Amino acid sequence: AKHGFTAEQTLEIAQKLYEKKLITYPRTGSRYIPEDVYAEIPKLLAFIGTQPEWKDKVRAKAVPTRRSVDGGKVTDHHALLVTGEKPLFLSKEDGIIYHMIAGRMIEAFSEKCVKDVTVVTAECAGMEFTVKGSVIKQAGWRAVYGEENKEETTIPGWQEGDTLTLKGSSITEGKTKPKPLHTEATLLSAMETAGKEIEDDALRQAMKDCGIGTPATRASIIETLSKRGYMERCKKSLVPTEKGLALNSVVKTMRIADVAMTGEWEKELARIERGELSADTFRKEIEAYTREITSELLSCDKLFGSRDSGCACPK
């Protein structure tokens, strides 16, 4: 979203970089690497540090942190990394994505950012007022993109029990605002974390690591919604069309639009894995549900009823 790429464009560029052997497999949802890959990280970071964009951001001979090392959390493919191949003759767009991956790698294996955080609570006329302040003591990973220079709220060296002089007061009146429209970035994030609000503990646990779609399919899901006219892009926002709103009004109360259904299926798949349920039984349940929801949707006049085509009959 920062550079104006759609999710599909980003995935296409990442695929090109992968085919050029510049990055590892891009269709991964993992943020972790196993031990054997971690052994290669110092060499890869040193390689990134030879590139002009990052030469001042990689500390020579620094030991990479292990925050992202956990073989148990690696799915089919480990986290996205650059390889040791030189990124030569890249287009502007390809270069942007490549260096985003390289920069995130440096951040992931840099030291923690250390802050001194101060919380002051002051009492006046029976009312308590709180202010927070922080000062970065060690920039760590924030130094990669210069985030340590962001404005910090510093608080004077007050001591507990100090009496302060009131210099003025004001009342600010405002109204709550609805959540903004989704961008591709926020929608991708929402798809990835879908299910966290499910109340049923078992279903929420089943959804923990899946969400809606996969890293390989989420971009195409968004693109399909656009191509079928359910939404359109307005600058960086995704806006539902009249057709999309009509679809939502029909299916929003159906199980097909309930993220908990995905949790139920994941739970059933786990039972199959444990030998508690036969795959054939699960398949028949899915087939029956598919027939049911298809019939229900096709009978909906709001979606498939007759309407004026806008074309005159030639006869």
Q: Can you say where each PLM-predicted feature lies in the sequence?
A:
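Basic, low-complexity terminal or inter-domain segments flanking catalytic cores
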Residues: 2-12, 26-315
